[in-house]
Structures are given as structure tokens and as C-alpha cells.
Amino acid sequence: MQTQLTEEMRQNARALEADSILRACVHCGFCTATCPTYQLLGDELDGPRGRIYLIKQVLEGNDVTLKTQEHLDRCLTCRNCETTCPSGVRYHNLLDIGRDIVEQKVKRPLPERMLREGLRQVVPRPAVFRALTQVGLVLRPFLPEQVRAKLPAETVKAKPRPPLRHKRRVLMLEGCAQPTLSPNTNAATARVLDRLGISVMPANEAGCCGAVDYHLNAQEKGLARARNNIDAWWPAIEAGAEAILQTASGCGAFVKEYGQMLKNDALYADKARQVSELAVDLVELLREELLEKLAIRGDKKLAFHCPCTLQHAQKLNGEVEKVLLRLGFTLTDVPDSHLCCGSAGTYALTHPDLARQLRDNKMNALESGKPEMIVTANIGCQTHLASAGRTSVRHWIEIVEQALEKE
């Protein structure tokens, strides 16, 4: 796809990067077949090809309106289109650039600005998020439905973590929402890894991965959080930590992008590249281990929801399923497993109606095999699916750790 950049855009390094990405697109339309928002809305501009045209028009100096912004905002960034694309278009990078340019040219309505700023001020701050969640649980009957649905109906308390006692050590990003919404997930991870001879090292100075800010178009703030995490992890990396572990695939996908996002930062480019190389999802670590050491036999019938950030962003489709099968669990078939559940970070709050439709479609697919429980690998998906109030939804490592306790 050829573009005629304006003089303003020729002076913009990110616009030049967008132009190079656009050139890979042959506008074949394969991407529309797997785009969740196109399937729901049937509008070309709510599919990847249409959004690519919109970004092209922005780069060429056409009028940028609230409608332009709306169509770009509706994208889930599920990256299903990238899995489908035969030309290897880096759509998510293009979308990030397009959204950033449009954000500078179009002033959002006040309610939108307030919601986005509120999310940015609350979600990445664990103490604030925890306090407001506790208040929300008390006030649940009086809250709007889309907010009420995001509050956990139940949480499993975090079990004690084992001491640091093994030579093999990994760092773990604790996350910002997960410690409140699913407090036992990281503890369960540490307990399973301990049985495999791996200790999880704390890095208390590390915080939010930066995805919340970045995807709400506060991209510089997101990059600042990335730099903070690199600084927090660096001493442990120099001391020999073998990996930076992520138990939430959304965070993992973002940390793996640090190298790309900070490639032009002279102070952080090399460190960011090394951090991205060390970043692994939990399943990447476990699949290489002798799981027989755990001596468990899974006794549950599960449906696994593979998050978009695991299957499309990190290209780990099918890997959790393989681990669960090795451990003896029974897995049901899930129709249309490639489609997004509608969580998409904060999307369920910024676009509640679309998110609810996608959630209900996904729950129907997950429940079609009549599982005892649904498991997933990302806190956003877990919370969003659980908000339907149907089959119980947990992180898959908690079910593994639960089976471990029975032995």
C-alpha cells in the first residue's frame, strides 16, 4: 500500500515507521474474516483493513475526526489479524502509531477523558486499586452494571510462598490488578515452581508493566513504567536470574515488546532488548520441566480459554493445553477458540456493550463441552469471563497447584 506523506509526517519518525508498515499491506482482506469487531458490526472501518486505510488517510493529511478516533478505539488489539495476515503486517505497531497521532489531533469528549484518566490513575497502582475494589464490593448494589460486573464475586486468598532455597531463580512481575482480583495466582505459581526446584525472586520496585497507560494513549507514561521495571529488574538480571516470568499473558506480551518500543532510547535500548529476551510466559518455563516431578494426576474436566495475548501476540497457542494434558487433566473442545473474549485490557470498561457481546459468545463456546471449570492465562480475561456469573473461571496454574496439594 503506497502513501503520500504530508511534509509534517515526513518529519515524524513514527509516521515514517507507519509508512514502512503500510507498504507490507496488499489489502487482500483476509484479516476481516477473523476480526471480532468486524464480525459484530459488519463495517469495513471496524476491521483491520478499514483501520489501515484510516491511518493512511491521517498520514496523508486528510481530516481527522471523532469518527476516525472511534473506529481506531473500537479495535481490541487482539492481533488475530496478524495471525491471519499472509504478508506479515505489524498491525498492532501501526495501530499504536495511528492512535497516538490521532490523539494529538482530536480532543476527546470530557466523559471519555475522565474515564480514561481515571483508569490510568487507578489500575496501575496496586494499593489504590485494592482500596477502591474493597469500597466497590461494599457499594456493589449501587454501581453501574459494567463496573459491578468487573468486581470479583469471589477470590481465593493467597497461600504462603516458599522461601528462596534453590539455585535456579526467576523474577516474576506481580502485576497491578491481579494481586487484588486473583491474589492466589502468583502464590500458586511460586509453590509449583518450588516443587520443580525453581525459586521466585521478589522485585518490589517493579510495578505495572505499562500496558494500561500505553493502550489508553498515554504512551510516554507507559514507556516510563517500562524503564522503571528495567531498572528494578537489572540487579537481579546481573546476578543471574534466568527469566522474567509473567503469569498474566497481557503483561507478558507487553514486556516482550520493551525492546521494540525502546529501540531508539540510547540509555535503555540494550537493556530493554535483554529484558524482552528474558521475558517468558509461565507456560514457556513449565513446558521445559520434568512435570513428572509434581506427581499429580489432574482429575478435572476443563475448558481452556487461550487469551489473545498468548496465542496471537506471543504465538503460544496450544502450549498450556499440552501442559494440562501432560498433567492428566481432560480438556474440552472450544469452537472459535481464536476469537477474543472482549476483555482486551480496559476495553470492557471503555466499550462495555461490544465487550459483553464478545464475552457471551465466548462463554457459549467454552461451555459447549460442559466443563467443570474454565481456566485461562490472563487476569483480564479471567475477570471478564467470570463477570457473566456462569461457569467458574480461574487461572490454570491455580488448578495445577490445587491438584498438587492433594498428593
Language model regions located:
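Iron-sulfur cluster-binding electron-transfer modules in prokaryotic oxidoreductases
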Residues: 15, 91-407
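Non-heme iron-sulfur electron-transfer modules
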Residues: 1-14, 37-70, 88-117, 394-400
